Amino acid sequence: MLEARGITFGYPGAKPLYSGFSLQVEPGERVVLQAPSGFGKTTLCRVLAGFERPQAGEVLLDGRPLPRRGVCPVQLIQQHPERAVDPRLRMRKTLAEAGDVPQELLGNLGIRDEWMQRYPHELSGGELQRFCIARALATRPRYLICDEVSTMLDAVTQAHIWRVLLDYAEREGAGMLLVSHTPALTERVATRKVKLSRSES
């Protein structure tokens, strides 16, 4: 189980975004995190994936802190893929950060061989997001945190990306925490919804 226990987080000089926030995601669950813009959902995703450290509370995986070294079993896929890659690396090297990436996965995501030698700025947002998803899934994570991963993509690419993500979660029994402002998507995907209120943020 992925658990946020009593999380308090805020940036220096600002009011805490969260105070004592708790959340649990079980294996195989698809939990949608709902709140208006500006409530800090993206920040919470980063805390849960180990990118940010809370001022109080802890993030636990099966009762233990997330590992500080090696590949994290909780993978975050961000809304803006250009912020998740090194702009100086060609995409082949970006993928190599995950180790050996199965050719079948690349095929399922529609990643073309000619894209491998390109830099991030030479790809569209949808193409770059496919690489970020491949990199995350290649590590065989136990939990996926998807923060508006398809917001800026066309409808066909959105459907394709979500099919790959959901197929992985169903096959591996992985838990998912999703942030999305698309009601049709959340209604179709969610097994449970969690709403953030002012008292929690």
Model-found features: residue ranges?
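A short, flexible loop at the N-terminus of ABC-type nucleotide-binding domains that lies
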Residues: 1-4, 8-20
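ABC ATPase NBD coupling module
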Residues: 53, 63-75, 89, 93
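Conserved ABC transporter NBD signature motif
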Residues: 57-70, 101, 198
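Q-loop/switch helix immediately C-terminal to the Walker
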Residues: 80, 87-102
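Conserved ABC ATPase signature
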Residues: 119-123, 127
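Hydrophobic anchor residue at the start of the ABC signature
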Residues: 133, 145
